[in-house]
Amino acid sequence: MSKLPLEDKEKGIHRAKIWEIGFYACNNLSTNLYMLLMGSISYYLIGIVGLGAVLAGSIGTIMRIWDGVTDPFVGLIVDKTDTKFGKNRPFIVIGQAILFGMSFAMFHVLPNVSMSMRFPLYIVFYCLYIIGYTCQCVVTKSAQPCLTNDPSQRPIFAMFDSVYLIVVFNFWYPIFLSGTLIPKYTLNSAQHADKIAALVAQNPNLANILIEKDGVQILNGFYNPEMWTYFQLLMGGLSFILAVLGIIGLWRKDRKEYFGVGNDQKVTVHDYLDVLAHNRGIQMLVVSASSDKLAANARSNSAVMAVLFGVIFGNYAMQGSVSAITTIPVLLITLLAFNQIARKLGQKKCLLVGTYGSLACAVLMIFVVLASANKGIFSVPTFSLTKIATFGNLFDFSQWSLMGLLWIVLAIFFGAFGNMAGNIVIPMTADCTDYEVYRSGRYVPGLMGTLFSFVDKLISSLAPTLVSVIYAMVGFSNALPTNDSPYSTGILWATIALYFGMPAIGWLCNVVAMKFYPLTKEKMEEIQEEVARIKLEAQKGAKA
């Protein structure tokens, strides 16, 4: 791919340098770090803002709906934007500034105001935060067409994106969360009685959340406000660095000559409605991606992971170990799949292979959970990335169990198949943008990106509510379960429903949606030839 010319004017193909795609993909990781930060916000709302568990989950859903509502408006602005700084890069800058400012206010300011003001201020801060999130997120989709329109190069974005997300989501974050962050900020009355008393005095709702074990009161780190202030500064700083890399990656290609037909276009609301009604590609992609995202958000929810490893398997630290052990194999299989399937057979085929593979792995993993639940027979070595001496635990076979080994093997393929189905949808939005140029002559990347995000956020916003409601049904109505919660049959089946049941529904939606998705590899080659012709005619007309 690196030996191909950056432009093939006869075929209307323009390509990006490989490093440009890699840097551009950092923008998606930048916003995903904020998603990780806010992924456990229900704990903060319960402990610090003072809401009940179900209400905290519902607030997350309501605010995600607001998140979706802002998308079409931002998309319209993107499609009308053409500055000296480009069409897309200004939105990274604006979004990043708002994200840091509002998240700082949420986690550093709120704990220091009166209880009566916390919830109203949280709503204000979060509404503004969402606008920033939308501004930066839209660029991940809207800039895809101007970066490259080569169908064989677009999956490279998914390859970089998968590497970044696997390393962060599967490797660094679980180990950091379960092995460092939560243990560091978990307090017990034997050692931190005065600190717990001070936090309860400042945040009265924490009194109902303290767990007693062997006569010692424990405040889980998820409910410690100091954890959130540190977490925000860490994620905000990393996100800023990644956003800068994303801007650099777009620098050469974020210009008018790479926008659609290469000239100015007036986009109206009527055009948007026509796209919604007739672009079958984006319709089916939205159905597939949104159902998948709902399931993924529910499965990866902090409460679900804490219960699965801390309560059902019996050792929360094993979450980080499993993630660390599986990361490299998952990464290698994912990259191989994107290279051999997405680039050679098409992105649609890649999504379907990932879907069927995920479903098969999930069925087998359910049996492992049922066989291991609360029996003390699930074991994998625990180790710390900061303590080299603990790496030897991996070769201590006494720390491995059969169920632990089976889980590791299945988790590798489960993760790889999940990445194939989930990460390929972003470059697929670029195909839908080109399909719209082919279908109607309109170049509306902002609409494609924000329409995708709108429905995606609207549906996936149900995840916190579903997690809260399902756990409330088995006895956790006042607070979400943590790794310190007691085991019960109810908590077992609630976790299975969230970790496996909801994803299964999403995978079935994938299969149905892809039956009607028109953009195969062969179709995209035809589309690029027609788009090149449309662009050439438009440029000749502009010169005349």
Language-model features: locations:
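Membrane-embedded alpha-helical bundles of multi-pass transporters/translocases
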Residues: 2-544
